[in-house]
Amino acid sequence: MKLKEINRTAIQAWSPAQQHPIYLAAGTSAQQLDATFSTNASLEIFELDLADSALAMKSCGSFSSPHRYHKLVWGPHGIENQGLPSGVLIAGGENGNIILYDASKIIAGDSEVIISQSEKHTGAVRALDVNSFQSNLVASGGNESEIYIWDLNNFSSPMTPGPKTQPQEDISCVAWNKQVQHILASASPSGKASVWDLRKNDLIIKVSDHSNRMHCSGLAWNPEVATQLVLASEDDRMPVIQMWDLRFATSPLKVLENHTRGILAIAWSVADPELLLSCGKDNRILCWNPNTAEVLYELPTSTQWCFDIQWCPRNPAVLSAAAFDGHISIYSIMGGSNDNANNLQADQLSSSFGNVDPFGTGKTLPPLQLPQQTSPQSTITPLKKPPKWIRRPVGASFAFGGKLVTLDNIKPTAQQPQQTAAHVVHISQVVTETDFIHRSNQLQTTLNAGNFLEYCQNKIETVQNEFERTVWSFLKVNFEEDARLKYLELLGYEKEELALKIASALEGNCKPKEADMDKEEVLAEEEAESDLDDIPVNEEEPVVEETSNTEVPPAPASDAINLKVSQDIDGLITQALLTGDYEAAVNLCLHDNRMADGIILAIAGGPELLAKTQRKYFSKTESKISKLISAVVMKDWLDILETCDLQNWKEALAAVMTYAKPEEFSALCGLLGSRLESSEDVELQAQACLCYICAGTVEQLVSFWTKTQDSCSPLSLQELVEKVVVLQRAVEKAQGAVPADMGALLAEKMNQYASLLASQGSLQTAISYLPTNTEQVSVQQLRERLSRALGQHQHLQQPAAAVTGIQKMHQRRPAAVPMQTYTQPQPPQVPAQPAAPAVPPQYYQQGRSATTVTSWSNQTPTALPSVPRQLVPSSDPQGDSTPPAFGLQSPAMASVPASTPFMYSQQYQNYPPVQQFTPSAGTPGIYQPLPYASSAGAPLPPPPSSSSSAAVYPPQFMLSASSQASAPPQSFCPPPAVSSGGCFQHGGPGSPTSYLPPPGARAPGTQHEPALIPASQRTDGFYQETAWGLEGPQNGWNDPPALSRAAKKKKVPQHFTPPAPITAPIMAPLGDPQAPAGMQTLQPQQQVPDQSAGPATFTPIQQQPLGPRNPSMPQGNMEGAPGAPIGDVIKPLQAIPTEKITKKPIPEEHMVLKTTFEGLIQKCLTAASDPQTKRKLDDAHKRLELLYDKLREQTLSPAIIGGLHNMAQSIECRSYADGLNIHTHIVSNSNFSETSAFMPVLKVVLTQANKLGV
């Protein structure tokens, strides 16, 4: 973009970087004439004012000179000591003269501006340069190989860098080295460049391209690499720029070719060594990257040659070009538009002529009628890459999850200047709240382990506040036996101490009541008792003594009973009793204030009369403890809690602990807490927290805590979450169910807590604390961000695919054979489509299995193995280690207790659910044994509806035997395995649908193979002979598959269609550690009706352990596809035609594994120097192909693939120790035969990477 313009045919020089404002000096060129053909010469200084919209630059000073100039430079000498405020202008003249000008005096308009001058050179001085380290040193070059070094402090006596070069020739340019101050280079038109060392005062090297003689027009040193320089060629036959390195001076390092005619001038940017300007006879100004020989930018210029070009030292984006058309143009390489400059030029032309006829008629010209043309705005493309001065050398930015992303541009070393600069981005985890994270980790550990008693006890011992200690004591009680009794002890009521007081009172150790002691003293003595339970004992003490210690002597036998029927009270009572009117007798006793007699009679009168009498008694009796006794007897504690003095809150809470029913306990404690919270006494308000803990009302606890505590600080919020989580687990333990939905206030606090955890990098923990049953926008947004950060976003959004139906295949079996019955755990049932047949349940987490369609299996989907299951299901749901959801799960999750979470179960990929495949008519199915229902009509569980979304489970294993006890049992026993005699199940949930166990040796007398005989031609006896007569070696669960001996071919039925080739893994190993234990029961096998054979179906079934063989067990006939293998006895099928097998591509979601592992091996190979280490790495690179094959075939379980993805992430973070920990976890929790081919290789690679520090 053109910024400014000077109408001069002149040599130019920019003011030094130390000078402000920016000036440009223009001296009349020696070998050129302007349009006026004037022979006058001048030296002018112009100011660069970019704020001025005018195109012309403002002239600040001018000096008429008798000299014309070949070269002009502006040095900073004298600026620092203010001797020369604007520096010194150094001019090279036509007659060998060098003139020093005071730039500040030229600007000021003084007439005496010359500091000094010399005519030592012979001929014109065409080369000048100022030393960048010592600004008082100036090099000049003239004719006859003259080179002088001038000291501006002593200008009269210059020195030479060494003897003149031979043969003598003109010096076209000189340049000081930008890195080493005593190195000077000079060049001559013949194309030779000489490098001088001023310390040695001698020439050290000559640079010349002997193969191509070029006319040198420019010389420039690399601003950063001391040994590199460029030479420009003016020859039209070779318009190139050669880049030389003095260390390899035999030939050019690079040749920059793009000009079509000779190059007149070059300039290397000091601010960015990757910017080199050149101008040539082809009217072009190019900006190069000399390191790559690429043209980064071409300036829009006129149709005239530019003979000089220079960078502005102060503003690195500005440059100037002097052209033969009499203009010095100022450009910016940052792009922009030239429309403004063009408009200004048009306006200037119009103002010059005005509206008067230029032919002298004096008449005003009419306006020019031109068609309106809307020309598009001309926009100049900026540089292809940002220049160095606007590139940030360093940068930092915070990212979600407490990550700090920093970058720095590493400067290339002098030894490797041609290499592209490395751009390093560091991603660091920043933890600012270390105490908060430490306590959060402790809580997380407790949630996983379930040791809440230990956690609460640790809190009691470590907290400093006495009230906090009391709170944690109350929370701890929830996890102990007989919680109410422990609550009473915390309130100060211990049974042992109370028993001692009562015993002392009964023995008469208490102060006896004197006859003259009035009622007031008695009450005062009772008030001295601290325990509320002692008060009714003291009131009832005379009754106790009268009834228990006083023996009533029997009436003398001679005394007759006198039943008075007089009209006094006794007589009326007697009459009422004689007639059986208990109620009247009780009323008379109460009227006569004979309370004891009335209550005794009411007991005999029945419960209704007793309750009525109790009410009347309490209405008449007014004492300190009458309300308490009334509440105890009437079991009505609501009135006590609503009216009691809040100073006696402990006594009221103790009474609730003792007498409240379980269903009303929580409400009563909450009522007392609400009264305490609304109290004006601050100390009483704090006690409301204890009541809410006893009540188990989490929302009230959160509301109270929010009002009284500073919940803005992370530690305060951590304290609240600790109490809430522990209390929720306590309520869950007490009620045996998941608590109610989370309220708005608690959801807000949990969202705030999850945000804090996420800001410290604990993303997995943070998402577990987010509520799942709230519609708050902030919660949903945070869940979205966390899901994306953890790679679970696609998994959360993908709906469940429709599950196709399967066809049943019935098989005949003897009725009297005892069977093992496998009870399959049933997931939560989802209504199925009416038209879809029943399918067996799936025993794996939704969204973690995928289908694999091979080219040989009639497009039969093969389910991936499921997530590993625990060996021994937990019998205690409360003891299970669950992820820290602390009762916040959805109801769908609540019915399936969780097992121990997989350590590295981050959702790396979302697999679609498994779809069952139904073979079409005439399609041979791959045989797989099916489970037999206990009765013919017992249907299998319905499949999930295609319209319902897949349940979203957290990354944990949802299998538990105790939770599925009600599942309908299914009997299963395929034909006996080779030499085993037990029930063997070929597969498991998500296991491959085809398999080929090694055939055993044939027993003597066996003549036929039942696998190759149609079902219609088999007999029970024949099948029994062939199936039970086979013996063979029994392999261990982890033995590799044995090589099968070639079997003798038998005759195949005429219309037999061979099954599809077997492409999936052979079979699950025996004793699969993933198989759930404790789920087999023995039941007698029921008779299955014989039905016609149907096509084979593909049903995932559970693997069974081998049992002892009973040779006497009879065998039945089994219908199936012709040639379908029976049990384990599967013989080779027809020979498959040989064809070329091409490997399938690795799935796109797993390509990151290959890229990461191979990239790490390449880094290790680069860093390794030991041949033995390199051999190990080469071998590892080859053996990893086994892993890639398994990825292609998708035969690895999701748990192993998840671990591999976590390992790849640790490699990308260069955390090899974590990668080795993940490796150990995968090996210890997976099938050995599944991982033995590649896991040792990965361990070698990780160990070497950690050792080499790559």
From Swiss-Prot:
Q: Which domain of life is it from?
A: Eukaryota
Which compartment or compartments is the protein found in? Cytoplasm; Cytoplasmic vesicle, COPII-coated vesicle membrane; Endoplasmic reticulum membrane
UniProt membrane topology term: Peripheral membrane protein
Task: Say where the protein is mainly found.
Answer: cytoplasm
Q: Which family does it belong to?
A: Belongs to the WD repeat SEC31 family.
- In this chain, the stretch annotated as Disordered covers 364-386, 818-892, 983-1008, 1058-1125
Where is composition skewed (Polar residues) in this entry? Answer: 847-863, 872-881
MF GO annotations = structural molecule activity
**Protein's name in the database:** Protein transport protein Sec31A
Q: Where is the composition biased (Low complexity)?
A: 364-383, 832-846, 1080-1091
Identify the stretches annotated as WD repeats: 4-47, 64-111, 120-160, 166-206, 209-254, 258-298, 301-341, 397-428
Q: How does it assemble?
A: COPII is composed of at least 5 proteins: the SEC23/24 complex, the SEC13/31 complex and SAR1. SEC13 and SEC31 make a 2:2 tetramer that forms the edge element of the COPII outer coat. The tetramer self-assembles in multiple copies to form the complete polyhedral cage. Interacts (via WD 8) with SEC13.
* Keyword list, A-Z: Cytoplasm, Cytoplasmic vesicle, Endoplasmic reticulum, ER-Golgi transport, Membrane, Protein transport, Repeat, Transport, WD repeat
A Pfam cross-reference name? WD40
Q: Which cellular component terms (GO) are annotated to the entry? A: COPII vesicle coat; COPII-coated ER to Golgi transport vesicle; endoplasmic reticulum exit site; endoplasmic reticulum membrane
Looking up InterPro entries in the UniProt record yields: SEC31-like, WD40/YVTN_repeat-like_dom_sf, WD40_repeat_dom_sf, WD40_rpt
GO BP annotations listed: COPII-coated vesicle cargo loading; digestive system development; endoplasmic reticulum organization; liver development; protein transport
Question: What exactly does this protein do?
Answer: Component of the coat protein complex II (COPII) which promotes the formation of transport vesicles from the endoplasmic reticulum (ER). The coat has two main functions, the physical deformation of the endoplasmic reticulum membrane into vesicles and the selection of cargo molecules.
Q: Which gene encodes it?
A: sec31a
